[in-house]
Amino acid sequence: MSSSASYWAGKARQFRAHVTARVGVDERARLIEWLSPPQLALFDSMHVADRRHGLDVVATLRADGVTDDEILLAGLLHDAGKGHTGVWPRVAYSLGQAFGPWVWRIASYIPGWRDALRRLMDHAETSAVLAGEAGCPARTVELIRHQDAPIDPVAGRALQLADEAN
């Protein structure tokens, strides 16, 4: 029961974080020193909740001692492929992960949700492609592509743990 309660508490925290997400002007300004113009444009194109999440993942990675810019860049941009998917399709997607694909089948009847759910399902690959197009290093692209099932046992797992923590 406690694992179920902690799961739902985590989902409630994610929901609250999504609807209250903000990125400060100073946070955005610091990225100018770190990102190339195409990478910054990709960051700016992301939903504000995904930008906030990316910044939080980077902060967690740094707190864990990660200094490798390729890993940090993957943490920042790993959800770029989610686009501007709203909160309710994201809730349906999470419910589908927890209870099975029948949730997605039902939710896909809601106008616009089929595409939104597909974006969420495919976001790792889409994010990797977008990162590559923005000039990210090949290693960053691969870390993003394999974010859910890391093939790099150190960097990939660090990214996955930081993502899950946020």
Task: Give short role names for the model-derived ranges.
Residues 1-42, 148-151, 166:
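Non-catalytic interface/linker regions that flank or bridge core catalytic/transmembrane domains
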Residues 32, 37-166:
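Divalent metal-dependent catalytic cores for phosphoryl transfer on phosphate-bearing substrates
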